[in-house]
Each structure stands twice: as C-alpha cells, then as structure tokens.
C-alpha cells in the first residue's frame, strides 16, 4: 500500500469522534499509514425527532455509507447497534473489534440505584429518561414486578445533554450505554451498572463496526487484523435474532450472546433475547445455548432459532409496527 492517508468517515458527535479516534490509532498501527478523520453529518444527528418516530433503522449510518460508495472516504466506523441488519453488497463489514462492556447504566441523582429511585417516597414517582423503547419495556417491566414507582420519559440528545437533565433536576435519572461513557471518559458518573438479567442490551451494543468498499481487497485484509472472532460471532447471532423478528434497530428488542466457559475452555455460546411492550406489561424473554459458532452461517442460525421460539410465544404482537 502507498503512504497516502486513509480517510476514515465518522459522525461528528463527541462519542463518534472518540470511537473513530481509537480505531484510527489501531489502523495506523496495522497499516503503517496515516489516517485522517472525515466528519460527516447524518440525518440522525440533525433531526430533533425521537428515533422511534424517524424509523431508527440506519438514520446514523446512511450518510456514512453514501460517502463510502462515492469514494469520499476509505472506511467508516459505526456503532454496531446502529447498523441495519441487511448488509449492502457493495460494502464489506471488514472488522468487528473486541467489544466494550455491553451493559446499560443508570446515572441518577444523589448516587441512587434504580431500586432506590423507585422506592415509594414523599417525592412521588421517579422520572427516568431514555431514548430507547427497548430500555423502556424492560425498566417498566422490572418496576412493575418489584413495586417501584418509576415513569420512563423519552429523551433525545447527546450524552452531555442527557446527563444534564439529571444535573438540572429535570429528571431523576437517565439510562445510557456503558460503552459510550467509557469511550468519552465519563464512566465515573455511573450510579449503577444495570444487570443484563434486568435489562438486556440492544443487539450489538458496545461493539463497533468497521466498513469499507467490498472491492478493496487490500484494505479489507488490513482491517481484518482488528477483527475479534468471538465478538463477531456474538453480534452476528444477536443481529440475526433482530432480523428474524423483522424488527428495526429502534424496536423494543434486547439480545446478548455470551460465551460459556468451563475453566479456561470456552464450551458454548448462550444467546438471550427479549421483546416487550414499552409499558412493561408483557415481555417475552427466552434463551438458547449451542456450540460456539465457527462460521457466519452458524451464528446466523443461532439467532434465527431463538427468534422462531420467541415468535411462537407471541413476540410479533409486542413490537408495534414490524418492518417489511
């Protein structure tokens, strides 16, 4: 490869720039070439509507993919949970690096946990903000089953503005992704890491996707050095579940694949999935376990298998509008 700088397409948010900066450093190391960040504004960044209203699927991705297809950038970095499950033929998912913490976290007033926030008190119902129907469904279900007084409030905006709602007293707490706070150096503001048994994360949460043109074999080979096979297998299974449910990335679907080990030896992969009504009145939550997938097709099959079981239990009726 020549010494010409590689152009990395990124969203302009603080989080996206932090993620892309970390990937740029890694790509410089594996290629020996300079990498420059090219900032691109996406529809999801400029629209003030709630993601559930603007469709969710692909709103942060389309502009980056268009820039790739036009040859304005050489590769792009996405939050994998924002990536539509259908992969365009012209683009390759060249690398899925090692995943960050996939959990959701609570940032609450007075250092409180979710249970403490929702405990009956003279202050009345606790108001907890999130932009995600998936989080709303599971938080509301947990509150219902534990007798907590919690109202989930839809919010938008970047991490700073979301945490700002708590600091200003407008909300009692907000729920965010741990990985995002890690990447911008604000993890110390977390008041509780929410167990995945309480809130399953979004499919692919905490993972990054590095995409480039499918016909750029040299770049695909170089970027492949950043790929983590276990992370790729896990997120492939999670996203296969999402696709088989015919749900978009703003649907109330949670999924997490993790590896089960016997001592130091990884023996199986467990996939958990949940779908629910946003008021938390009904949840379908199931899991399946199988051999660790060794191919893309095996990982896809694990997701489809669990989706079929969830659909048989009535998952489709809980998602509102399904995508076609």
UniProtKB/Swiss-Prot annotation:
Domain of life of the native organism: Bacteria
Residues with S-(dipyrrolylmethanemethyl)cysteine modification: 249
Cofactor(s) required, per the database record: dipyrromethane
Description of how the protein assembles with itself and partners: Monomer.
GO (cellular component) term, any one: cytoplasm
EC number assigned by the record: 2.5.1.61
Designated name of the protein: Porphobilinogen deaminase 1
Pfam families per record: Porphobil_deam, Porphobil_deamC
Function noted in UniProt: Tetrapolymerization of the monopyrrole PBG into the hydroxymethylbilane pre-uroporphyrinogen in several discrete steps.
Main EC class the enzyme belongs to: transferase
GO molecular function: hydroxymethylbilane synthase activity
Catalytic activity: 4 porphobilinogen + H2O = hydroxymethylbilane + 4 NH4(+)
SUPFAM superfamilies: Periplasmic binding protein-like II, Porphobilinogen deaminase (hydroxymethylbilane synthase), C-terminal domain
Gene it is expressed from: hemC1
Pathway: Porphyrin-containing compound metabolism; protoporphyrin-IX biosynthesis; coproporphyrinogen-III from 5-aminolevulinate: step 2/4
UniProt cross-references to NCBIfam families, sorted A to Z: hemC
General remark: The porphobilinogen subunits are added to the dipyrromethane group.
Keyword Transferase carried by entry: yes
Cofactor binding notes: Binds 1 dipyrromethane group covalently.
Keywords of this entry: Porphyrin biosynthesis, Transferase
HAMAP family listed in its UniProt record: Porphobil_deam (MF_00260)
InterPro entries given in the database record: HemC, Porphobilin_deaminase_cofac_BS, Porphobilin_deaminase_N, Porphobilinogen_deaminase_C, Porphobilinogen_deaminase_C_sf
């Amino acid at each position: 490869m020549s010494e010409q700088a590689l152009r990395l397409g990124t969203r302009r948010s603080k989080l996206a720039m932090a993620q892309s900066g970390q990937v740029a450093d890694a790509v410089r190391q594996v290629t020996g070439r300079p990498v420059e960040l090219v900032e691109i504004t996406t529809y999801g960044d400029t629209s003030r509507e709630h993601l559930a209203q603007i469709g969710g699927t692909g709103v942060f991705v389309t502009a980056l993919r268009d820039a790739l297809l036009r040859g304005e950038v050489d590769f792009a970095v996405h939050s994998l949970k924002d990536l539509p499950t259908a992969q365009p033929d012209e683009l390759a998912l060249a690398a899925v690096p090692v995943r960050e913490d996939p959990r959701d976290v609570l940032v609450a007033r007075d250092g409180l946990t979710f249970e403490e926030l929702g405990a009956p008190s003279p202050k009345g119902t606790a108001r907890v903000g999130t932009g995600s129907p998936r989080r709303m469904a599971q938080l509301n279900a947990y509150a219902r089953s534990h007798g907590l007084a919690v109202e989930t409030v839809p919010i938008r905006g970047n991490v700073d503005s979301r945490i700002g709602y708590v600091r200003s007293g407008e909300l009692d707490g907000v729920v965010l992704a741990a990985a995002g706070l890690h990447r911008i150096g604000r993890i110390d503001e977390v008041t509780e890491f929410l167990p995945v048994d309480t809130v399953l994360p979004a499919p692919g949460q905490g993972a990054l996707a590095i995409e480039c043109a499918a016909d750029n074999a040299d770049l695909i080979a170089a970027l492949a050095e950043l790929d983590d096979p276990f992370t790729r297998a896990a997120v492939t299974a999670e996203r296969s579940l999402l696709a088989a449910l015919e749900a978009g990335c703003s649907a109330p679907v949670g999924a997490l694949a993790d590896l089960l080990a016997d001592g130091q030896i990884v023996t199986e992969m467990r996939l958990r999935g949940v779908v629910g009504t946003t008021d938390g009145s009904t949840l379908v939550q199931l899991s399946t376990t199988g051999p660790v997938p060794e191919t893309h097709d095996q990982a896809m099959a694990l997701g489809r298998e669990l989706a079929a079981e969830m659909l048989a239990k009535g998952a489709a009726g809980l998602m509102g509008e399904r995508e076609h």
